Amino acid sequence: MARRGTLREKISLFTVILTISITSSFLYAANTRGGNLMELTLVDVDGKKVRLDQLAGDQPLLLYFWATWCKPCRITQPKVAALAKKYKDKVKVVGINVGGLDSPKDIKKYLSRNRITYTMLIDHNDEAVKAYSVSAIPVIILVDETGKILFHDNEPLANLEKFLSG
């Protein structure tokens, strides 16, 4: 009997380790696909297709995932706009509207009302959400020119400015 308990414990431990290993490798792969992440094609508020790598040029991209109906996003948005101005020579800020609930017309109204001038894209099919493992909004992700994630934070501005100025 004692031997069976030990075997069950070993099997349970093996299962836990295997689960953690598989989950970790999935999350790592999702966030380190190199150039593939930059090859995503989304649409802008006018319906024009835009590839992320075309926007970046030789600068990193600061991707801001948000939605008009998201209250925390409304609080964060002015801070992101300030970062876009302050670090315009270091990074290109791109807003990515997610969730599929906002129409392009609603997004344009929101941008105009809030005087948002940085590039805005729409992720209708959650391609970017999946590629960048976005689980909640608002979130900011800093990606270098090759698609490597440099910064990924669900509490968007806590450490980002320190990271950008360093």
Each predicted region: which residue ranges?
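Short active-site neighborhood of thiol/selenol oxidoreductases, capturing the structured segment around
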Residues: 53-70
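Conserved redox-active cysteine motifs that mediate thiol-disulfide chemistry
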Residues: 65-82
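Bacterial N-terminal signal peptides that target proteins for export
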Residues: 4-14
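N-terminal "domain-start" segment that seeds a small globular fold
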Residues: 27-53
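Bacterial N-terminal signal peptides
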Residues: 15-23
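Thiol/disulfide oxidoreductase modules built on the thioredoxin-like
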Residues: 112-116, 124-164
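Conserved segment of the thioredoxin-like fold in thiol-based oxidoreductases
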Residues: 75, 85-125, 137
